[in-house]
Swiss-Prot record:
Family membership noted in the UniProt record: Belongs to the NAD-dependent glycerol-3-phosphate dehydrogenase family.
Protein name from the UniProt record: Glycerol-3-phosphate dehydrogenase [NAD(P)+]
Catalytic activity, as annotated: sn-glycerol 3-phosphate + NAD(+) = dihydroxyacetone phosphate + NADH + H(+); sn-glycerol 3-phosphate + NADP(+) = dihydroxyacetone phosphate + NADPH + H(+)
Keywords: Cytoplasm, Lipid biosynthesis, Lipid metabolism, NAD, NADP, Nucleotide-binding, Oxidoreductase, Phospholipid biosynthesis, Phospholipid metabolism
Active site: 194 (proton acceptor)
Database matches in Gene3D superfamilies: N-(1-d-carboxylethyl)-l-norvaline Dehydrogenase, domain 2 (1.10.1040.10), NAD(P)-binding Rossmann-like Domain (3.40.50.720)
EC number(s) recorded for this UniProt protein: 1.1.1.94
Binding site for sn-glycerol 3-phosphate: 108, 139, 141, 194, 247, 257-259
Matching PANTHER family: GLYCEROL-3-PHOSPHATE DEHYDROGENASE (PTHR11728), GLYCEROL-3-PHOSPHATE DEHYDROGENASE [NAD(+)] 2, CHLOROPLASTIC (PTHR11728:SF1)
Function statement: Catalyzes the reduction of the glycolytic intermediate dihydroxyacetone phosphate (DHAP) to sn-glycerol 3-phosphate (G3P), the key precursor for phospholipid synthesis.
Source domain of life: Bacteria
Organism: Streptococcus sanguinis (strain SK36)
Pathway terms, separated by semicolons: Membrane lipid metabolism; glycerophospholipid metabolism
């Protein structure tokens, strides 16, 4: 692939890690952000210490505070911003673009209130004449490992296979490998909903439960993620792949996961407001829990784990009471679509 100009919208941990992957592949990387001090740090010190204290970035990676300058002559634009601000930022990008580009995103969540997936938001806010079909970049990946070039395998999903292949080639190298998929709904819902289960898995750890309980919540969590995804039109096989069970494992078992850490703190009895303040980063699983719970109610999809976590976070339900309620649900067969 010839050298590409890629604008990375969002200088967070994952945006920074993906910028390094693209730079390693010989592409011109322009990171855009709205915090002047952070932009100056990336350009002058070649660091982003808020997220990576000991990492020095290649000096060829440039950061911009001016959005039009970051987007100038870009071949592709990668959104890596929190779900709750995606629509606002997409509007800004649409206004600043003056030519057609490939549009990708690597965020995981459902928009509050609308319950929309991120690709849908981008389709609504960026005119078709300015973009390709949206490509979702998702899968089992910790920024802390990707930034040190640890082996990582993820998925590039798009309605248009050729566009997905473009992104596959754009990112893939000796330590970072992408597989293509055309099931955008499946890949996006898997990436968003696994954050809920990760909060629950962390809570079990914080309460002192062992591996049996953690395996239970991951596998039964995958079942209800699949139920909702299929209701929305996803291919159930997607959930057995990298963006499904792969991402659920990596997020639901690791201290690198901010969702797992948030759940762990909840399990230890900490208050949610204190957890969010101490984390200093967006915990997507918190807002996604509400969106998924409301969506499940609307579509009549059985999601007992999501419902339990919703009650704990938004209705001040005692965690142990929520667990007791799940464990005393009506007996089911494992392979029933409606079973726990």
């Amino acid at each position: 692939m010839d050298k590409q100009r890629v604008a990375v919208i969002g200088p967070g941990s994952w945006g920074t890690a993906l910028s390094q992957v693209l730079n390693d592949n010989g592409h011109e990387v322009r990171i855009w952000g709205n915090i002047a001090e952070q932009i100056n740090e990336i350009n002058d010190e070649h660091t982003n210490k808020r997220y990576f204290k000991d990492i020095v970035l290649d000096e060829k990676i440039k950061a911009y505070h001016d959005l039009e300058e970051a987007l100038k002559d870009a071949d592709a634009v990668l959104f890596v911003v929190p779900t709750k601000v995606t629509r606002l930022v997409a509007k800004q990008v649409a206004q600043a673009l003056d030519h057609k580009v490939k549009i990708m995103h690597a965020s995981k969540g459902l928009e509050p209130n609308t319950h929309e997936r991120i690709s849908t938001i981008l389709e609504e806010e960026i005119p078709a004449e300015l973009r390709s079909e949206i490509v979702v970049v998702s899968g089992p990946s910790h920024a802390e490992e990707t930034i040190v070039r640890d082996i990582t395998l993820i998925t590039a999903a798009s309605k248009d296979l050729e566009t997905a292949k473009y992104v596959q080639e754009l990112f893939s190298n000796h330590y970072f490998r992408l597989y293509t998929n055309t099931d955008v709904i499946g890949v996006e819902t898997a990436g968003a909903l696994k954050n809920i289960i990760a909060v629950g898995a962390g809570a079990l750890h914080g309460l002192g439960y062992g591996d049996n309980a953690k395996a239970a919540i991951i596998t039964r969590g995958l079942a209800e993620i699949t139920r909702l995804g299929v209701k929305l039109g996803a291919n159930p096989l997607t959930y057995s792949g990298l963006s499904g069970v792969g991402d659920l494992i990596v997020t639901g078992t690791s201290v690198h996961s901010r969702n797992w850490r948030a759940g762990n703190a909840l399990g230890r009895g900490e208050k949610l407001a204190d957890i969010e303040a101490n984390m200093g980063m967006v915990i997507e699983g918190i807002s996604t829990t509400k969106a998924a719970y409301e969506l499940a109610q609307e579509l009549d999809v059985y999601m007992p784990i999501t419902q339990a976590i919703y009650k704990v976070i938004y209705q001040n339900c005692n965690i142990k009471e929520a667990i007791y309620e799940i464990m005393n649900n009506e007996f089911k067969a494992e392979n029933e679509w409606t079973s726990f």
